[in-house]
């Protein structure tokens, strides 16, 4: 893997986030290079620019290297993308001043004069993004999209015309093309959220456009729901929560529990939040917020004082279009650190991913709870001789649950 980005006289050191990933993965692709090449060749001057789907900040860093105060609004659904962009700006001594950071549901400023995008894998999400742009971009605004040449076809160009304005594609360079779309000034309505139900669990589910398994229960979650852990848990984390279905069911099974939902996708976190409210799962009389929600890189920014008794985890094995197991490693390692001594990590995964090897290495134990031809449910318990914080007198007896620091303390 190279970390040296070099295009049209721009020299940068770019790394993925987090840095400790497979050596064959890099922080940008040829579509990033093609977009920058296009800007250089057309002698684009610095104007108020929105950058959308910039995986690890290659586009953002390039524009700030071309002009240190290039006015930018940077939108992403992935927390790791935002953190990676900040990391690469810092590593290249580039200013992040006056960059407006947006999640995938916030509207870009109305004063934007140029938009740079990368084509995401999820075309329903992409159509949603184009719809949102149609609500704020004046007629004639240019939107430049970098994509693999093989991803561009007639139906994709029709998608542009339907949701934002007419589009055309450049010649191929390094197996990529730049699509130029011109906003037609017509405002499109946002698509309705996907809604469905799980009758046997009495749950109603809403999925935003960039949430995995939109419109149905994925088979990994199904086998997990059929094999939820037994016990009396008061503090639970749904790690990589997606629409939150595992955490929702955990609350049904353990009504005295406090649930924390966390995901790298902001749309996933918002879907989980909406689903909690939709299903009205709060237990009457239980003190404090019974559900909290975090947009985070796994458990990186979880309060160190939090000690969950159970973590439910359905790890992704891809980051964008890259196949990788570093996310599972990170989830398992951070789960071991976060869990209360004796706490359980309950995991579902494809059999071929061999998560049992990782769990055995980290936890020194691993039990197969259930399996079928494709999936396996694994359970690992944290057994540590190191004293828990409360054993050293560090916790107060007036906290309502092991996650009190997450919820802001006791309500009196």
UniProtKB/Swiss-Prot annotation:
Polar residues: bias regions: 394-406
Keyword Methyltransferase: yes
Pfam families with a match to the protein in the record: MTS
Enzyme class: transferase
Name this protein carries in UniProt: Ribosomal RNA large subunit methyltransferase G
Enzymatic reactions: guanosine(1835) in 23S rRNA + S-adenosyl-L-methionine = N(2)-methylguanosine(1835) in 23S rRNA + S-adenosyl-L-homocysteine + H(+)
Coarse class of the protein's main subcellular location: cytoplasm
SUPFAM superfamilies in alphabetical order: S-adenosyl-L-methionine-dependent methyltransferases
UniProt function note: Specifically methylates the guanine in position 1835 (m2G1835) of 23S rRNA.
CDD domains attached to this UniProt entry: AdoMet_MTases (cd02440)
Family, as annotated: Belongs to the methyltransferase superfamily. RlmG family.
Region span, Disordered: 386-412
Subcellular location as annotated: Cytoplasm
Keywords: Cytoplasm, Methyltransferase, rRNA processing, S-adenosyl-L-methionine, Transferase
Xref: Gene3D superfamilies: Vaccinia Virus protein VP39
EC number: 2.1.1.174
UniProt keyword Acyltransferase, yes or no: no
HAMAP family from the UniProt entry: 23SrRNA_methyltr_G
Organism, scientific name: Shewanella sediminis (strain HAW-EB3)
Single GO molecular function: 23S rRNA (guanine(1835)-N(2))-methyltransferase activity
GO cellular component, one term: cytoplasm
């Amino acid at each position: 893997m190279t970390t040296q980005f070099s295009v049209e006289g721009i020299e940068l050191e770019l790394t993925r986030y987090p840095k400790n990933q497979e050596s064959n993965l890099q922080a940008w692709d040829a579509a990033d290079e093609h977009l920058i090449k296009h800007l250089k060749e057309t002698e684009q001057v610095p104007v108020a620019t929105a950058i959308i789907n910039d995986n690890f900040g290659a586009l953002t860093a390039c524009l700030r290297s071309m002009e240190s105060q290039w006015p930018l609004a940077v939108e992403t659904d992935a927390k790791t993308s935002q953190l990676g962009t900040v990391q690469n700006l810092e590593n290249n001594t580039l200013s992040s001043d006056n960059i407006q950071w947006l999640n995938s549901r916030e509207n870009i400023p109305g004063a934007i004069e140029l938009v740079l995008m990368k084509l995401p894998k999820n075309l329903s999400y992409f159509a949603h993004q184009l719809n949102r742009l149609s609500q704020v971009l004046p007629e004639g605004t240019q939107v430049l999209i970098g994509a693999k040449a093989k991803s561009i076809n007639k139906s994709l160009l029709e998608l542009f015309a339907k949701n934002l304005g007419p589009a055309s594609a450049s010649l191929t360079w390094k197996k990529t093309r730049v699509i130029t779309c011109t906003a037609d000034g017509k405002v499109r309505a946002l698509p309705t959220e996907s809604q469905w139900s799980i009758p046997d669990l009495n749950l109603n589910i809403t999925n935003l456009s960039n949430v995995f398994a939109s419109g149905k229960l994925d088979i990994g979650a199904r086998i997990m729901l059929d094999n939820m852990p037994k016990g009396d848990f008061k503090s639970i984390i749904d790690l990589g929560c997606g629409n939150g279905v595992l955490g929702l069911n955990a609350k049904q099974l353990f009504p005295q529990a406090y649930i924390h939902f966390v995901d790298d996708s902001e749309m996933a976190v918002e879907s989980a939040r909406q689903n909690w409210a939709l299903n009205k799962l709060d237990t009457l009389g239980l003190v404090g917020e019974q559900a909290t929600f975090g947009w985070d890189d796994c458990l990186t920014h979880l309060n160190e004082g939090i000690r969950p008794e159970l973590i439910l985890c359905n790890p992704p094995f891809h980051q964008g279009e890259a196949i990788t197991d570093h996310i599972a490693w990170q989830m398992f390692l951070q789960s071991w650190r976060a869990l209360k001594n004796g706490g359980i990590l309950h995991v579902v995964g494809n059999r071929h991913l061999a998560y049992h090897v990782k769990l055995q290495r980290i936890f020194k134990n691993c039990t197969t709870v259930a399996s079928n031809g494709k999936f396996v449910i694994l359970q690992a318990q944290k057994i540590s001789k190191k004293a828990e914080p409360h054993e050293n007198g560090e916790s107060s007896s007036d906290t309502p649950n092991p996650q009190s620091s997450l919820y802001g303390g006791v309500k009196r």
